């Protein structure tokens, strides 16, 4: 044992213990040499749960999914060099979707930077504006001041990551050799005796009385709508429904709002706006005077287009932090306050005669017609098309199941075909940067928190993150993956690129012709290829009772999927025109 090893051990023990005391319970470690002392010390901690993922890109998204589902800060650790760069996609997603990650990168000491040392690159501010904060940590030193410094940065990292708006932070640790700390006796047995832990308290933004009264006045007796995009706050669901009923306003609820599957059926929750807001004749009858938007922008493009063309209205965007979430540039009033506070204070101050019953009835009538057509079409078809897959998941998922939804077509199919249901289903997705990468790993991370967990994903997105399946095999995780295999990029069939047949398949369709049964075998998953509704139901039933990884593959046709969507939308449009 040398003095260097003791200094290294004490310094890192102080930092790690403070992370744990501030609320960190899990760390995802990517193996490497320079990060050895941090990895060993984390593994030694009696409370910290460790997951080791050999693929840094997968590790980043696994941590993201775990933090998203648990709403706790999760630590990521890697060695120096390009390992840290592989975290970048997950860091960007965490930043945009406000997920608390604490990214720790080991680095060469200062004397080995920019001199051609092996496995070394410039890691300072590596993630740029995609993190809330960056710190290049000091080298370990043997002094009380530096122990306090290490503890202080542990608390500070958690505080910044968890403070509204939540997000990732990056700490870079330059470390000198030798890199093996002292583990006997445990470095954590006496931790906390020399220095007190920092207690962190959080508050939320509120509005002053005059702003509240102004908002109440502007909403009373008006034709308004709530637009609720992705927002993972269960505590908002019932208060939002209650306020909507009092105002007589519809809630246009994105699948990731939580309102389509929070355990109750409410007619104020509108789930088929994507279908009927395509029609100009219908849109003209649904022009509001007030819009109040919560969460990020919903996935629906017809809804976005409708909101963009509204004019001469009050358009409130509510955000608890400092974000400016208004991509359509329609906001007239940006409200930075806690959402629950706003809902409660409006409920308390809104007069009982504030509603316009005819206005709400118009919305619910259109929605009822559209929903009944969707449900009837899905009930009557025996073809296992993409919409039918979503409808069957809606029917078959058990109470309190989790559903992680892939980007591209899956989230849009869920928007169309997952109507409101009186079951509690937790829906999650990576809708920050909206990438198709890292979705398998994110779902596996979320499966640590939610059980049973299902993943609905396209074939290209699944292929993109097959490496992530190693975590399921290694830790015997329970996840059921439903692959919608339309052999390529199905969403491009709905975009203008589809009108360029000369290059469409080579540049956008991108057929891979992969057989995923071999991927299932490689990672010890139970594999089910389903070609009928009965086979899908049987596979989901088996997977619900099986402990481990299940892969259910459904092969569909991109061109038929587009035609089916268009036929459904046309049928809804005709029915609504007849209603008028």
UniProtKB/Swiss-Prot annotation:
The record's free-text note on cofactor binding: Binds 1 thiamine pyrophosphate per subunit.
**Biological or metabolic pathway of the protein:** Quinol/quinone metabolism; 1,4-dihydroxy-2-naphthoate biosynthesis; 1,4-dihydroxy-2-naphthoate from chorismate: step 2/7; Quinol/quinone metabolism; menaquinone biosynthesis
Q: Which reaction does it catalyse?
A: isochorismate + 2-oxoglutarate + H(+) = 5-enolpyruvoyl-6-hydroxy-2-succinyl-cyclohex-3-ene-1-carboxylate + CO2
Q: Does the keyword Magnesium apply?
A: yes
Q: Which GO terms describe its molecular function?
A: 2-succinyl-5-enolpyruvyl-6-hydroxy-3-cyclohexene-1-carboxylic-acid synthase activity; magnesium ion binding; manganese ion binding; thiamine pyrophosphate binding
Q: Which residues form the signal peptide?
A: none
Q: Which family does it belong to?
A: Belongs to the TPP enzyme family. MenD subfamily.
Name this protein carries in UniProt: 2-succinyl-5-enolpyruvyl-6-hydroxy-3-cyclohexene-1-carboxylate synthase
């Amino acid at each position: 044992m040398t003095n260097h090893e003791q200094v290294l051990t004490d310094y890192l023990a102080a930092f790690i213990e403070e992370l744990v005391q501030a609320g960190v319970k899990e760390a995802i470690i990517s193996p490497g040499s320079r990060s050895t002392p941090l990895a060993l010390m984390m593994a030694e901690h009696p409370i910290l749960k460790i997951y080791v993922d050999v693929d840094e890109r997968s590790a980043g998204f696994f941590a993201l999914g775990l933090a998203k589902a648990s709403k706790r800060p999760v630590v990521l650790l890697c060695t120096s060099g390009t390992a840290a760069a592989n975290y970048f996609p997950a860091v960007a997603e965490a930043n945009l979707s406000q997920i608390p990650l604490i990214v720790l990168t080991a680095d060469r000491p200062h004397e080995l930077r920019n001199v051609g040392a092996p496995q070394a690159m410039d890691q300072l501010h590596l993630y740029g504006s995609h993190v809330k904060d960056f710190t290049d940590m000091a080298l370990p030193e043997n002094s009380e001041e530096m122990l306090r410094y290490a503890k202080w940065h542990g608390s500070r990292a958690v505080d910044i990551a968890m403070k509204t708006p939540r997000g990732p932070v990056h700490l870079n640790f330059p470390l000198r050799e030798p890199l093996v700390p002292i583990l006997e006796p445990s470095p954590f047995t006496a931790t906390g005796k020399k220095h007190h832990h920092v207690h962190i308290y959080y508050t939320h933004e509120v509005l002053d009385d005059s702003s509240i009264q102004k908002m109440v006045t502007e909403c009373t007796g008006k034709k308004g709508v709530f637009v609720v995009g992705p927002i993972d706050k269960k505590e908002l669901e019932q208060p939002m429904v209650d306020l909507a009923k009092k105002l007589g306003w519809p809630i246009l609820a994105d699948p990731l709002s939580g309102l389509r599957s929070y355990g109750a059926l409410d007619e104020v929750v509108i789930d088929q706006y994507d279908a009927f807001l395509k029609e100009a004749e219908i849109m003209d009858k649904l022009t509001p005077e007030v819009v109040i938007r919560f969460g990020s922008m919903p996935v629906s493009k017809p809804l976005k287009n409708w909101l963009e063309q509204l004019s001469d209205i009050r358009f409130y965007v509510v955000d608890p932090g400092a974000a400016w979430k208004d991509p359509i540039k329609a906001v007239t009033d940006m409200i930075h306050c806690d959402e629950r506070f706003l809902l409660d204070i409006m409920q308390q101050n809104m007069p009982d005669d504030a509603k316009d019953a005819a206005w709400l009835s118009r919305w619910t009538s259109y929605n009822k017609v559209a929903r009944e057509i969707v449900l009837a079409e899905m009930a009557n078809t025996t073809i296992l098309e993409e919409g039918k897959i979503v409808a069957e998941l809606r029917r078959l998922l058990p109470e309190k199941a989790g559903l992680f939804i892939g980007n591209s077509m899956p989230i849009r199919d869920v928007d169309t075909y997952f109507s409101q249901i009186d079951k509690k289903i937790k829906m999650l997705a990576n809708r920050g940067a909206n990438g198709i990468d890292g979705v398998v790993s994110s779902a596996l991370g979320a499966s640590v928190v939610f059980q049973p967990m299902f993943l609905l994903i396209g074939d290209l997105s699944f292929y993109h993150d097959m490496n992530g399946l190693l975590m399921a095999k290694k830790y015997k995780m329970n996840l059921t993956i439903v692959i919608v295999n339309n052999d390529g990029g199905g969403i491009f069939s709905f975009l203008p690129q589809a009108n360029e047949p000369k290059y469409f398949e080579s540049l956008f369709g991108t057929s891979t012709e992969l057989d995923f049964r071999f991927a299932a075998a490689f990672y010890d998953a139970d594999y089910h290829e389903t070609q009928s509704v009965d086979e899908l139901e049987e596979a989901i039933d088996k997977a619900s009772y099986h402990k481990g990884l299940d892969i259910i593959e459904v092969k569909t046709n991109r061109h038929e999927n587009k035609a089916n969507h268009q036929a459904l939308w046309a049928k809804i449009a005709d029915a609504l025109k007849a209603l008028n």
